[in-house]
Amino acid sequence: MRPALSDYQHVASGKVREIYRVDDEHLLLVASDRISAYDYVLDSTIPDKGRVLTAMSAFFFGLVDAPNHLAGPPDDPRIPDEVLGRALVVRRLEMLPVECVARGYLTGSGLLDYQATGKVCGIALPPGLVEASRFATPLFTPATKAALGDHDENISFDRVVEMVGALRANQLRDRTLQTYVQAADHALTRGIIIADTKFEFGIDRHGNLLLADEIFTPDSSRYWPADDYRAGVVQTSFDKQFVRSWLTGSESGWDRGSDRPPPPLPEHIVEATRARYINAYERISELKFDDWIGPGA
């Protein structure tokens, strides 16, 4: 259920976020406690998740050099009290139709592509790589931006050129990889591996390319504890993979290949997911989540 904000017109709903109009140039981006997996929005919610996503994005927007869509601080007076801590005022952009994915390690859909073709998004890789193999240099592996309920599809860089032009495609690749490396280097100093991440970009009215939506959250990134890292096995994680793994495990009783939606998450999975998200934020930022603004769960 989305918050009814009397001062702002509701514009759109995503899997996790609600978007409201502030004025002709600005939007209010509100992160809910919803969680999605395998193209479904689950019936369960994760308490405080929207606040963690907002805190994490705000931290990384301040850390990385890439220009972004923020138009005010997390305590901007334009943010209503009822969504304080889970909302940001952002610039209205023309969003580009590409999910910009940076991969430092082989896992997830990238691993499936590699096992089937020896490539990821058209990039040929050496033989013998395994789950969680580290790449010598990070890869730019874009994907289509699917509608709600559809699957994102990994695409080649040449396809990105066809979609947005060569100049913009090169900007997207360079900005994605530079931003990933900057954040991943920071995370390693905190004992965290950012295995991969995805970004969205938009164009402002002056033609500038801006980083948008969320960045380096446990929803959009894979976080692994560096001390436990070992190639060849599925890694312990502080991200949404924990929920995906439960859904496809025997305890859930759910068949991913069926037409049935996933079951609700049991309380112990909800609590463990909340703890993992908060742990990721506190380790990366060296800040206490209890000090983050806004009403908690």
UniProtKB/Swiss-Prot annotation:
Sorted UniProt keywords: ATP-binding, Ligase, Nucleotide-binding, Purine biosynthesis
Keyword Secreted: no
UniProt EC number: 6.3.2.6
Gene Ontology annotations of biological process type: 'de novo' IMP biosynthetic process
Superkingdom in the source lineage: Bacteria
Keyword Oxidoreductase: no
Catalytic activity: 5-amino-1-(5-phospho-D-ribosyl)imidazole-4-carboxylate + L-aspartate + ATP = (2S)-2-[5-amino-1-(5-phospho-beta-D-ribosyl)imidazole-4-carboxamido]succinate + ADP + phosphate + 2 H(+)
Annotated metabolic or biological route of this protein: Purine metabolism; IMP biosynthesis via de novo pathway; 5-amino-1-(5-phospho-D-ribosyl)imidazole-4-carboxamide from 5-amino-1-(5-phospho-D-ribosyl)imidazole-4-carboxylate: step 1/2
GO terms for cellular component: cytoplasm
Family per record: Belongs to the SAICAR synthetase family.
UniProt name for this protein: Phosphoribosylaminoimidazole-succinocarboxamide synthase
Species of origin: Mycobacterium tuberculosis (strain ATCC 25177 / H37Ra)
UniProt gene name: purC
